[in-house]
Design a protein with these regions (language model features):
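Thr-Gly-centered strand-to-loop micro-motif
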Residues: 22, 47, 284, 341, ...
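Conserved, mostly hydrophobic/aromatic
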Residues: 174, 194, 211, 244, ...
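Terminal RNA-binding accessory module
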Residues: 354-450
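Glycine-centered loop/turn positions within well-structured domains
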Residues: 121, 172, 217, 279-280, ...
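Proteins enriched for Cys/Gly/acidic motifs involved in redox and nucleic-acid/cofactor modification
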Residues: 1-217, 255, 270, 292-303, ...
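Conserved SAM/AdoMet-binding glycine-rich loop
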Residues: 90-94, 99, 104, 203-324, ...
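Short flexible coil/turn linkers enriched for glycine and charged/polar residues
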Residues: 156-160, 170-172, 266, 276, ...
Length: 450
């Protein structure tokens, strides 16, 4: 008789408590939910209390230097915690683990486990390595891993919205970006597992899913491309809202826009990172599109969905950026009229093409000034966008009690704008019709239409 040796050994967790902190993008949030699922299967118990934890995992981001500096600071705090609890196991997982394995495993960091984004299945074994007195390390990248069959443990307790990772990795190699080096090549998850996960969420009361990938538009398994996947998920129920992030402008197809326009429960919001408004700058960034191409895609979005929100990412002070190129970014912002933007100073990342070949030659004070100008303009654009919504009516999916008052609820429009309104008899998870009566640059305020 064949016996599975692993089935005979005690579970690694044996009731030990796991605490996880997540930094960075939505993909990391989804990854943390996968990690908790893997660890619970090994007998670990998830806790939201750091003080109760026997093992702490920090899921990290390497997209900018300040993201990594936050982690180093957090590690210092964890080392102080260990003085009170010497048995505490500390692990660094995710992109920073992949990028900085050597530094993290040096003496004095306090790190016991280092695990990259493709090695989460190995975490129980890495804990056993630590139990045996060694450091547990696995940062091997995979060409196949998608964690497709693992049911994530939903850590956001609102029970309304959930993330579903549909692919991993990136093949674009933008010159400034570390992601292809920390997350590996693109791999698309089997479509049926994605649809099954979305259906299970809906049956369990969730009313919104966000399909995640570094570039969702390049998703493909067999005959199923991203527009087809989006359609199939939306067909689960008209009561299930479907969002996605993130899109690469070079891959936004008319087929996708037609699919979005044809199905009311596919949210009318597209995150379309521009990074710069200058074609020459975009060439240095290896973005594979021009300003003219980007604006044509924006025009197509408006043509198919006049009410679609468009948001973006912008970088101030990339290598060799001239004042004219900076002004081109400001003019692009005005021409598009973004509803919202994530805006950053350029942070050179070791190992990227830009670091190896272009340098980081824009003075910090110039970067700061240019970023300030971008932020000030976007604040005006966001406020103008919100003011245009005053008097309009939207269907809101209620997500939570408002931070302003327990007597108010908040939820988002299809365009991903947050709306605050009086609670009345409504509950989290309800769809509510709201008329917008006022706004700030970040929030809409409304009244329920009976």
């Amino acid at each position: 008789m064949n016996v599975n040796i692993n089935s005979l050994r005690p579970l690694t967790g044996s009731g030990r408590k796991l605490y996880i902190e997540t930094y960075g993008c939505q993909m990391n949030v989804g990854d943390s939910e996968i990690v908790v699922s893997i660890m619970q299967q090994e007998g670990f118990r998830y806790t939201e209390s750091l003080e109760e934890a026997d093992i702490v995992l920090i899921n990290t981001c390497s997209i900018r230097d300040n993201a990594e500096q936050r982690i180093w600071g957090r590690l210092s705090e964890m080392r102080h915690m260990r003085k009170k609890k010497p048995s505490l196991i500390i692990g660094i997982i995710g992109c920073m683990a992949e990028r900085l394995k050597e530094e993290l495993t040096k003496g004095g960091t306090g790190v016991d486990i280092v695990a990259g984004p493709d090695s989460y299945r190995d975490l129980p074994r890495l804990v056993r390595e630590v139990d045996g007195g060694a450091t547990g390390v696995n940062v091997e990248l995979s060409k196949e891993e998608t964690y497709a069959e693992i049911a994530p443990v939903r850590l956001d307790k609102n029970g309304v919205s959930a993330f579903i990772a549909i692919m991993r990795g990136c093949n674009n190699y933008c010159s400034y970006c570390v992601v292809p080096y920390t997350r590996g090549i693109e791999r698309s998850r089997d479509a049926e597992t994605i649809i099954a996960e979305a259906r299970t969420l809906f049956e369990n009361g969730y009313r919104e899913v966000t399909l995640l990938g570094q570039n969702v538009n390049s998703y493909r398994t067999g005959e199923v491309d991203f527009p087809e996947l989006l359609k199939r998920v939306a067909e689960i129920s008209p009561l299930l809202r479907v969002r996605f992030a993130t899109s690469h402008p070079k891959d936004i197809s008319d087929k996708l826009l037609e699919t979005m326009a044809s199905m009311p429960n596919i949210c009318k919001a597209i995150h379309l990172p521009a990074q710069s408004g200058s074609t020459e700058m975009l060439k240095r960034m290896n973005r594979k599109y021009t300003r003219e191409w980007y604006l044509e895609r924006v025009e197509a979005i408006r043509r198919y969905m006049p009410d679609c929100a468009i948001t973006t990412d912008l970088i101030a002070g990339f290598a060799h950026e001239t004042e004219e190129e900076h002004e081109a970014t400001l003019s692009l912002m005005q021409e598009v009229g973004y509803d919202f933007a994530y805006m950053f100073k350029y942070s050179e990342r070791p190992g990227t093409f830009a670091q190896r070949n272009l340098g980081d030659d824009i003075p910090e004070d110039v970067k700061t000034r240019r970023l300030t100008e971008i932020i000030e303009l976007q604040n005006r654009l966001s406020e103008e966008s919100n003011k245009r919504d005053i008097g309009k009516e939207f269907e809101i999916l209620v997500e939570c009690t408002s931070k302003r008052s327990d007597a108010q609820l908040s939820g988002r429009t299809s365009q991903n704008k947050m709306v605050v309104f009086d609670r009345g008899n409504h509950q989290i998870g309800d769809y509510v019709k709201v008329r917008i009566t006022g706004c700030s640059s970040a929030t809409l305020f409304g009244e329920v239409i009976i």
